[in-house]
UniProtKB/Swiss-Prot annotation:
Name recorded for this polypeptide: Acetate kinase
GO molecular function, one term: ATP binding
Gene3D superfamilies: 3.30.420.40
Binding site for ATP: K16, H207, L208, G209, N210, G211, D282, C283, R284, G333, I334, G335, E336, N337
GO terms of biological process kind: acetate metabolic process; acetyl-CoA biosynthetic process
Gene assigned in the entry: ackA
Amino acid sequence: MSKLVLILNCGSSSLKFAILDPATGEEKLSGLAEAFFLPEARIKWKLNGEKGNADLGAGAAHTEALNFIASNILTDELKNSIAAIGHRIVHGGEKYTQSVIVTDEVVKGIEDAAQFAPLHNPAHLIGIREAFNAFPHLKDKNVVVFDTAFHQTMSEEAFLYALPYSLYKEHGVRRYGAHGTSHYFISREVAEYVGKPADQVNAIICHLGNGGSVSVVRNGQCIDTSMGLTPLEGLVMGTRCGDIDPAIIFYLYKTLGMSMEQIEETLVKKSGLLGLTEVTSDCRYAEDNYDNASKPEAKRALNVYSYRLAKYIGAYMAVLGDDHLDAIAFTGGIGENSAHVRELALNHLKLFGIQIDNERNLAARFGKDGVITTDDSAFKAIVLPTNEELVIAQDTARLCF
């Protein structure tokens, strides 16, 4: 068996894992451990096409999950074929512009960047430490892949906020972006789709899932993106508000008497599609009930969501200026599967000569890629499934094999 990469994506209460062959992209194992610290902590997986699941025990967390993977899921042959471990890291700050092998200095850098990703980075560090314990022979073969790295090619005019400059110089307050691993992968997919070298492609990439972001790529490099200092800025998301007037925070605090903790919870966990529908963060509810007169919240939510998305796409078309836009790409759970969202958003952009093909748009769902605009559309829009795990596996292999 060829050299394989174990991929870990640790959240505060979950662990997503996979084993890939970086040379072929073949997935040997995939799974999710979730409900950490709760009585119902559990793990589910698919190994060589066969599914399995198990209870981890009340209160189980990352340690128990990784030990279970190593002891109960992996065959000896598969375990011996793991040659390196790749970790997804949400925030690397300004310091990390590419993937690196884990060292004490790198761990310190991830800790320092945790102020901008307080829910994610500490969980990633737990994953790294537990991977060291579960696979001690691979301690020097752990690689971290940063979601912020792809966006570090932005210029000051794109990443600076109009705040006192000292806040940036002394405290790192600036735009960092997120979903960079996905944006990088899709930029390369667009290049292949339109028949251009990766370093010559110009694209607008819409990664739409429970979290969502848009990036604009010129000559294969990111020049702007919608998420900011944290993943709260930008698009309407599942539970996150995206762009708002910052003075709303003062209003909630001073006039409504909300605490800063309550305000943070509202903006991060109670807004977005959940806030607009006051029912659910699931985009499918808004789609399924869009024309249901008894559920006006569905149309309201989907219209706001799509309008915000269209504004970003239009703005980034302007940012490209004279550079020809090769394609607008949709990816992520919503981007790949919601023909309705794509249609609503692109219909706002008819001024640019974009014409959606309804039949193609409906066909490009559920894992199927494809162009969704007409042949005479001024610009192509394409649906492309993302594969962040493959990027992590390939970067890990590049540094370790």
